[in-house]
Amino acid sequence: MTEKIISEIILDLVFQCNDFSQFSNKLKDTKSKLIFESIFWEKVFLSWINIILKKKDYELPNYISEKKSFSLGLRIISNQEIASLNKKWMQKNGPTDVLSFPIISDESLNNLDHIELGDIFISLEMALEQSYEYKHTIYREMIWLASHGFLHLLGWEHNNENDLENMLNLQEYLITRLD
């Protein structure tokens, strides 16, 4: 992770991962096994927060851009669990790859010192399928999905093609800064 990290930033990450030992034979490289480590994700999200806060060409709500303390949740779950969340909260049937549930949405948060961003849920099974489909590693796919969910927590949306292209470009930028 080559970005210089702003030392004042504090991140409280709540990380949970189901037991996916049945997939261990599909995770042959050392880098892919990092996706099950809390400390790995903490470094990733800290790096991304620093990048976003330092780059002035990304519009952030004031209640994010002026803060130094954040928390978020990341859960790696099964297709069954994400399908249930997808049905309950998005009114869509079946599993999806990533769901984000932002907590921040109100300017009244300006007075808070610590900002709870929300929660990201990633289906490992969908990520594995997509990594095969797109011919890249599960590590790459999980980072891609996490970056997508993270940007949603910060308020990015993709309601049209231009917004989607901008969001995907920012995801790629964030990911390339990790290597």
Curated annotation (Swiss-Prot):
Cofactor: Zn(2+)
HAMAP family to which the protein is assigned, alphabetical: Endoribonucl_YbeY
Enzyme class: hydrolase
Domain of life the protein comes from: Bacteria
GO molecular function terms attached to this record: metalloendopeptidase activity; RNA endonuclease activity; zinc ion binding
Family membership: Belongs to the endoribonuclease YbeY family.
Cofactor note: Binds 1 zinc ion.
Record localization: Cytoplasm
GO biological process, one term: rRNA processing
InterPro entries xrefs: MetalPrtase_cat_dom_sf_prd (IPR023091), YbeY (IPR002036), YbeY_CS (IPR020549)
Protein name as it appears in the record: Endoribonuclease YbeY
One annotated Gene Ontology cellular component of this protein: cytoplasm
UniProt entry tagged with the keyword Zinc: yes
Residues bound to Zn(2+): H148, H152, H158
Gene3D superfamilies given in the database record: Metalloproteases ('zincins'), catalytic domain
